[in-house]
From Swiss-Prot:
<dbReference type="GO" id="GO:0005634">
    <property type="term" value="C:nucleus"/>
</dbReference>
<dbReference type="Pfam" id="PF00079">
    <property type="entry name" value="Serpin"/>
</dbReference>
<dbReference type="InterPro" id="IPR042178">
    <property type="entry name" value="Serpin_sf_1"/>
</dbReference>
<dbReference type="InterPro" id="IPR023796">
    <property type="entry name" value="Serpin_dom"/>
</dbReference>
<keyword id="KW-0539">Nucleus</keyword>
<dbReference type="InterPro" id="IPR036186">
    <property type="entry name" value="Serpin_sf"/>
</dbReference>
<comment type="similarity">
    <text>Belongs to the serpin family. Ov-serpin subfamily.</text>
</comment>
<dbReference type="InterPro" id="IPR042185">
    <property type="entry name" value="Serpin_sf_2"/>
</dbReference>
<keyword id="KW-0722">Serine protease inhibitor</keyword>
<feature type="site" description="Reactive bond">
    <location>
        <begin position="362"/>
        <end position="363"/>
    </location>
</feature>
<comment type="function">
    <text>Protease inhibitor that may play a role in the regulation of protease activities during hematopoiesis and apoptosis induced by TNF. May regulate protease activities in the cytoplasm and in the nucleus.</text>
</comment>
<protein>
    <recommendedName>
        <fullName>Serpin B10</fullName>
    </recommendedName>
</protein>
<dbReference type="GO" id="GO:0005737">
    <property type="term" value="C:cytoplasm"/>
</dbReference>
<dbReference type="InterPro" id="IPR023795">
    <property type="entry name" value="Serpin_CS"/>
</dbReference>
<dbReference type="InterPro" id="IPR000215">
    <property type="entry name" value="Serpin_fam"/>
</dbReference>
<dbReference type="GO" id="GO:0005615">
    <property type="term" value="C:extracellular space"/>
</dbReference>
<dbReference type="GO" id="GO:0004867">
    <property type="term" value="F:serine-type endopeptidase inhibitor activity"/>
</dbReference>
Length: 397
């Protein structure tokens, strides 16, 4: 399980940096866990270089140095240093079970499915394995003869799976008669804070987008005993907000400088994030916390991003090797669609009834102010595994 959580978190940071290249000044919100789980279903049916490339991008490769090797050596290393597939899939099965069995205080709804053109039938063994490890059932559909009808059916299924929170995942031109295989992944998260904000303390305040521009936001406020941590380079402060039952928590990384987010994003690595957010770096303080209310709904067509990260063969009709999935040649991944929804408010990540539990600490604690009034990074983390379920950047109200 440690290997999988590390893989997901490494993928989260690499993927976020790639997204940031074309999203300057924009909010980012995605689920590295969701993307990894959905792509792992595809990876289950790949072979050869297609499998090696996917393993590298998803951080399933045990030897990350291979990315710096010459092409011939890189291919050899990638093929022989991948973690055992059965171990990876078994860990996904365990992680999915862990997350879904989390306390009633948090609800995570996912819509995760592969849709393949019906003239490219799936192997029976592949269908069985996807159901065993991921609890999902790939669908054979008529892209050739009824592509738009299939698009509407996919959107309807996603909407139902996410309790109406994720609408129109696939836009009008998302599929056509040439589509061979589409992967959809949508997530909706709802949680209740351990310590809730009082609605009457929420007031309008300025959020500094940069040193010269501000926008008004509804700023929530609380004074509570919370865990904080400090980052020396680049200078930043972090804070952990638990959800009820403490299975999950929100981690916020706030640069000291209003314009410091770019430097923080460039500096962050898996090793540094693990160190910054480890239990022994946390300090319990009396915190005056100011945090904006916000709602993010982001949709990503992942084909270009994933291709640029190194898994181009899967999207190439002449190079893709999905022989573990189907006997038909020329099967390739046409697109990957991902959409996430989150709302941060006084009660939690979506308005819901709930009462916060009080932790009594009979000692004098340092008092600090944590004022999230300028761009910051945030993560929703599964605490038992330390896996990042959601990754976000809030910089534009």
């Amino acid at each position: 399980m440690d290997f999988l959580a590390k893989s997901i978190n490494q993928f989260a940071l690499e993927f976020s940096k790639k997204l940031a290249e074309s999203a300057e000044g924009k909010n980012i919100f995605f689920s590295p866990w969701g993307i990894s789980a959905s792509l792992a279903m595809v990876y289950l049916g790949t072979k050869g270089t297609t499998a090696a490339q996917m393993a590298q991008v998803l951080q399933f490769s045990r030897d990350q140095d291979s990315k710096f090797c010459p092409d011939s050596e890189k291919k050899r290393k990638m093929e022989f240093n991948v973690g055992k597939p059965e171990e990876i899939y078994s860990d996904f099965q365990t992680l999915i079970s862990e997350i879904n069995s989390s306390s009633h205080a948090c609800i995570l709804k996912t819509a995760n499915r592969i849709y393949g053109e019906k003239t490219f039938p799936f192997h029976k063994k592949y269908l069985e394995d996807v159901k065993t490890y991921f609890g999902a059932e790939p669908q054979s559909v008529n892209f050739i003869g009824a592509s738009d009808q299939i698009r509407k059916e996919i959107n309807s299924w996603v909407e139902k799976q996410t309790e109406g929170k994720i609408l129109n995942l696939l836009p009008d031109d998302a599929v056509d008669p040439t589509t061979r295989m589409v992967l959809v992944n949508a997530l909706y998260f709802k949680g209740v804070w351990e310590h809730q904000f009082l609605v009457q303390n929420t007031t309008e305040k300025s959020f500094k987008i940069n040193k010269t521009t501000s926008k008004p936001v509804q700023m929530m406020s609380m004074k509570e005993k919370l865990q904080v941590f400090y980052i020396e380079s680049p200078q930043a402060m972090g804070l952990q907000l638990y959800y009820e039952s403490r299975d999950l928590s929100l981690l916020i990384l706030l640069p000291e400088d209003v314009d410091g987010l770019d430097q923080l994003e460039k500096t962050i690595t898996y090793e540094k994030l693990s160190e910054w957010t480890s239990a022994d770096m946390m300090e319990l303080c009396n915190v005056q916390l100011n945090l904006p209310k916000f709602k993010l709904e982001e949709t990503y067509d992942l084909k270009s991003t994933l291709s640029s990260m190194g898994m181009s063969d899967a999207f190439n009709q002449s190079k893709a090797d999905f022989s573990g999935m189907s006997s038909e040649r020329n099967l390739f991944l046409s697109n990957v669609f991902h959409k996430c929804f989150v709302e941060i408010n006084e009660q939690g990540t979506e308005a819901a009834a709930g009462t916060g539990s009080e932790v009594s600490v009979r000692m004098k604690l340092p008092s600090i102010e944590f004022n999230a009034d300028h761009p910051f990074l945030f993560f929703i983390r599964h605490n038992k595994t330390n896996g990042i379920l959601f990754y976000g950047r809030f910089c534009s109200p």
